[in-house]
Curated annotation (Swiss-Prot):
During early embryogenesis, abundantly expressed within the notochord and anterior somites. At later stages, accumulates within the axial fin fold, dorsal spinal cord neurons, then in lateral line neuromasts. It comes from Danio rerio (Zebrafish). It comes from the Eukaryota. There is a cross-link at residues 35-38 (Cysteinyl-selenocysteine (Cys-Sec)). The gene is Selenom. This is Selenoprotein M. InterPro entries: Sep15/SelM_sf (IPR038219), Sep15_SelM (IPR039992), Sep15_SelM_dom (IPR014912), Thioredoxin-like_sf (IPR036249). The active site is at 35 (nucleophile), 38 (nucleophile). The keyword NAD does not apply.
Amino acid sequence: MWPLIFTALLPSVILTYEVNIEKLSGLARARVETCGGUQLNRMREVKAFVTQDIPLYHNLVMKHIPGADPELVLLNHYYEELDRIPLSEMTRAEINKLLAELGFYKKGHPEDQVPEEFRFSPAKDSPFESRLSSAAAPETTEPSDSQHTDL
């Protein structure tokens, strides 16, 4: 009897995505790649997520690819792919829970503004900000160095 129960539960255990922090260091944004047609219509939970929930997430976009199975593509600041997560077998609640675990900010309404502390979420900060601030900072000279002694 136990082998039968184990065999029945194995697919659900395999399909659950576990967040690997080391693999996803540098996670900054994501996109959902899926077809827009009949294949998505057969997956009610995923279609509900795509049509109703994606507009609520900051730094999450949708890309239509004809014939593609729905996948969540995790990207870093340079749009380099970190991981792909198949969404076909997941429920809407599981997808939303996964995005929350990954640190994505979900707005209440699509037109709501993103609070400043979540501007870069799921990333903690921007790698470009330190470069911009150091490049924009003018070099200061000591007043004693700028005085002419020959006058």
